[in-house]
Regions:
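ABC-family P-loop ATPase nucleotide-binding domain
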Residues: 1-33, 331-332
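Conserved protein kinase catalytic domain
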Residues: 98, 142, 245, 325-326
Length: 332
């Protein structure tokens, strides 16, 4: 029987602890670099993730997002820097790291001549499960992903949503502590997206540590408690989803309709430096102003009326995560 070596010692400076729990991070990334010939895909990335956190990883195509995730999943080697998962260095102990993580890539390969059960059984064998344990674990993941009723269906007959469920089931087969999910809901229809998000919430409720990427920030805002933004290979933001909503100030965004000539509203905005014109409309405009005061909206509308701008209707919109993302990238 092979003896698993103990986790690598982690330098004291490389550990950040939660003030409330005193728990060391389950994922620790330090000064990570990855260079392909002359292209620096990842440049000095560092972050920590605590056990049980659900972390959203956001970045445009070519930002270094997938490269970072592949290195975390032991599928690529860093040029320099380090990644530790569960106390094991990904370069020194890749086998031990793979036992602790579940990796779900953005592209799902189909084995057309396999059924759902045969596919999961194949991966169960690769993890070294004995027959009884393998059957039990396959039954558990098929029940969780709602694939049990179609266990005998051929893989090439699956919808995109069912295929993603199967890929998630394979990811969960060895019951990993950490899930690394690269664009898991990409290409799914609205119904399948909702169902997939429900599965992620259930896994988070079980205490899994989840590191998930997506281009749809609003979805990550619903699922994640922490956000990481990467741009040009560097981390440009690391904070809670709630704090991200208020990045760059608290913006109040309103759609205003006026009676008479809408040009009067545009002129009024130009004379008030604290107000920004976002978009002109047929009978009004979309405007924005910065304020953290609850009474600010009423005060601004009252000022408009007193200044001779006849407001007939308005609608307030919440600041979107996409707005914060754009603001952050502008200031990089």
């Amino acid at each position: 029987m092979t003896t698993i070596p103990p986790p690598l010692p982690v330098e004291e400076a490389a550990i950040t602890r939660s003030v409330t729990t005193g728990v060391p991070p389950i994922i620790s990334v330090r000064d990570l670099h990855r260079t392909f010939e002359k292209v620096q895909a990842v440049r000095g990335v560092s972050f920590d993730i605590l056990p049980g956190q659900v972390v959203g990883f956001i970045g445009a195509n070519g930002s270094g997002k997938t490269t970072t995730m592949r290195m975390m999943a032991t599928l690529d080697l860093p040029t320099s820097g380090s990644i530790s998962i569960g106390g094991y260095d990904v370069v020194g102990y890749p086998r031990e790291v793979r036992q602790k993580i579940g990796w779900m890539p953005d592209a799902f390969g189909v084995y057309p001549h396999m059924t759902i059960f045969e596919y999961l059984d194949f991966y169960g064998r690769s993890f070294g499960f004995k027959k009884a344990d393998r059957a039990r674990r396959i039954a558990e993941v098929m029940e969780f992903t709602d694939l049990a009723p179609i266990a005998d269906r051929m893989m090439d007959k699956l919808s995109k949503g069912m295929g993603q469920r199967l890929c998630l089931g394979r990811t969960l087969l060895h019951d990993p502590d950490v899930l690394i999910l690269d664009e898991p809901a990409a290409g799914l229809d609205p119904k399948a997206r909702v169902e997939f998000k429900q599965l992620i919430r259930l896994l988070a409720g079980e205490g899994k540590t989840i590191f998930i990427s997506s281009h749809i920030l609003s979805e990550l805002g619903e699922m994640c408690d922490t956000m990481l933004f990467i741009d040009a290979g560097r981390i440009v933001h690391h904070g809670s989803s709630e704090s991200l909503q208020h990045h760059g100030g608290t913006q109040i965004l309103i759609d205003v309709q006026v009676s008479g000539e809408p040009g009067r509203l545009v002129q009024w905005v130009a004379l008030n430096p604290g107000v920004k014109l976002i978009e002109e409309r047929k009978r009004g405009a979309r405007i924005a102003f910065e304020s953290s005061e609850p009474e600010a909206l009423a005060a601004q509308l009252r000022k408009m009326v007193l200044d001779g701008v006849p407001v007939t209707d308005f609608h307030r919109e919440s600041r979107k995560l996409e707005d914060a993302f754009v603001d952050i990238l502008r200031n990089v």
